[in-house]
């Protein structure tokens, strides 16, 4: 290590490096080797929960544990400490006369943050705390930096997000939140697997952005000398698999959108998309409700979910309402009536709804009304269906009213949690929708997509009637962990 670097270290870091060197001089590897535990902290607590001090003493049972040293007290020939593993903490009781002088020195010189292995007798203290009375201490890894001063609950938000590892060490609530996230994803997989869906993987690098209305990240493939984009959705590749006969597929994976960041948006996020042949959007509503209720039950149990003080009746059937009916109920404006674009624009002006340059159809105005007046009222789980064709380029038209599509979005607490529809499987109609999107892009709509001719070709080989779904995993995790920002459910959120 250079002298220059040593000068950058603070006193605590220098002392820890000196201890590292001392361990090496004793023939101890400061960064350890494989260590076999017989139990973790929670397993011991569960196993001995009903035994008091005397009963434990009579059983004379031993255990071998390992973890990070997070508290340490005592002096002279006796010490107490807590080791933290992934399940929690357990106390160790170390006596010099029980472990020997040389072994006691390892404990005595250990710093908070170091990893230790402990063999010993399972006991309970006079205060009733389950502990391990050490018979041998093994040094497993040296921490060269001290834990933050606010170790018992890291509070600096910037540090929490930039150095998630420190947050996980110091904040048990945060640690458990990410365990819950993992369980939510596992349970969604389990639910779909049991219904015969096949999990697949599709490309992250695309030649053309498609499957969603979003601005992509652009990159360049040097060997092929072509520009490519990071996927903004998995939709079009998954539907190619439906064409190929897979019938029931899903993918859980990262999506990338070059857009703004706020409490519910991060440039990269996790979604699940699901496609089922021979189904329509009504079937997919049932599937969506089942997925979310199963995930909620697995981590929250039966009953409603409390989110930021509001009781969400996630365990009850979700409300279903047509977009036009929802708008009429809130504003009194009836978009069921036939009207020209100019008439719709006049109504928008009267209601002070902004009209963008690329609003070329009445459907654009209808969608703007929904976003302006209805979204903020949707607290309980609600399926809003019947989106206009103009804002649904991949959805099948409703056979009874071709101004609208067989599409729905799921809203909870005013936020969109899912988007689904009866898939458009008519290649001629799909091409005309793509062309309309390309025109909107020319008029300044950054979120409009281009034309994916390869996808059109795939549809020309025939795709069965199909229902498809996309759910934002991160927002669902926010709901089920009662958190208000997406950064709290992403281990490593995007930072400046």
UniProtKB/Swiss-Prot annotation:
Subcellular location: Cytoplasm
Binding positions for Mg(2+) 1 per the UniProt entry: 409, 416
Cofactor stoichiometry and binding remark: Binds 3 Mg(2+) ions per subunit.
Catalysed conversion reaction: tRNA(Lys) + L-lysine + ATP = L-lysyl-tRNA(Lys) + AMP + diphosphate
NCBIfam families cross-referenced by the UniProt entry: lysS_bact, PRK00484.1
EC class (word): ligase
Record-stated family: Belongs to the class-II aminoacyl-tRNA synthetase family.
Keyword Coiled coil on entry: no
Designated name of the protein: Lysine--tRNA ligase
UniProt GO cellular component terms: cytoplasm; cytosol
Source organism of the structure: Streptococcus pneumoniae (strain ATCC BAA-255 / R6)
Record text on subunit structure and interactions: Homodimer.
């Amino acid at each position: 290590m250079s002298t220059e670097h040593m000068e950058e270290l603070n006193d605590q870091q220098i002392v820890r490096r000196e201890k590292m060197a001392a361990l090496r001089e004793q023939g101890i590897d400061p960064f350890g080797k494989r260590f076999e535990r017989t139990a973790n902290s929670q397993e011991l607590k569960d196993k001995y929960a009903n035994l008091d001090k005397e009963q434990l003493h009579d059983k004379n049972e031993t255990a071998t544990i390992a973890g990070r040293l997070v508290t340490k007290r005592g002096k002279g020939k006796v010490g107490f400490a807590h080791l933290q593993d992934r399940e929690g903490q357990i106390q160790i009781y170390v006596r010099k006369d029980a472990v020997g002088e040389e072994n006691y020195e390892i404990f005595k010189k250990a710093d908070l943050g170091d990893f230790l292995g402990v063999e010993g007798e399972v006991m309970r203290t006079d205060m009733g705390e389950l502990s391990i009375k050490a018979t041998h201490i093994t040094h497993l890894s040296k921490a060269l930096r001290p834990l933050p001063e606010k170790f018992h609950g890291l509070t600096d938000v910037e540090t929490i997000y930039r150095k998630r590892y420190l947050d996980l060490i110091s904040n048990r609530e945060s640690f458990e939140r990410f365990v819950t996230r993992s369980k939510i994803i596992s349970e969604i997989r389990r639910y779909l697997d049991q219904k015969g869906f096949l999990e697949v993987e599709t490309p992250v690098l695309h030649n053309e952005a498609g499957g969603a209305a979003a601005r992509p990240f652009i990159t360049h493939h040097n060997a092929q000398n072509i520009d490519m984009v990071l996927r903004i959705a998995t939709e079009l590749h998954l539907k190619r698999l439906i064409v190929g006969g897979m019938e029931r597929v899903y993918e859980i994976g990262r999506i990338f959108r070059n857009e703004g960041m706020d409490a519910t948006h991060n440039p990269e996020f996790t979604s699940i998309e699901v496609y089922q042949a021979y189904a329509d959007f009504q079937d997919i509503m049932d599937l969506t409700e089942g997925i979310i209720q199963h995930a909620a039950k697995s981590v929250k149990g039966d009953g409603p979910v409390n989110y930021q003080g509001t009781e969400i009746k996630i365990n009850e059937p979700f409300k279903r309402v047509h977009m036009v009916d929802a708008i009429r109920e809130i504003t009194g404006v009836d978009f069921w009536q036939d009207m020209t674009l100019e008439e719709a624009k006049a109504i928008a002006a009267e209601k002070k709804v902004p009209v963008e340059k690329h609003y070329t159809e009445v459907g654009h105005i209808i969608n703007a009304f929904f976003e302006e007046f209805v979204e903020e009222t949707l607290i309980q789980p609600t399926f809003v269906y019947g989106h206009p064709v103009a804002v649904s380029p991949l959805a099948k038209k409703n056979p009874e009213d071709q101004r609208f599509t067989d599409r729905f979005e799921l809203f909870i607490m005013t936020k969109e949690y899912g988007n689904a529809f009866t898939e458009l499987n008519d290649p001629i109609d799909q091409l005309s929708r793509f062309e309309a999107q390309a025109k909107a892009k020319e008029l300044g709509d950054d979120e409009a997509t281009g034309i994916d001719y390869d996808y059109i070709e795939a549809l020309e080989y025939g795709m069965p009637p199909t229902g498809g779904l996309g759910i934002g995993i991160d927002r669902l995790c926010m709901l089920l962990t009662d958190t208000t920002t997406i950064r709290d459910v992403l281990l490593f959120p995007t930072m400046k």
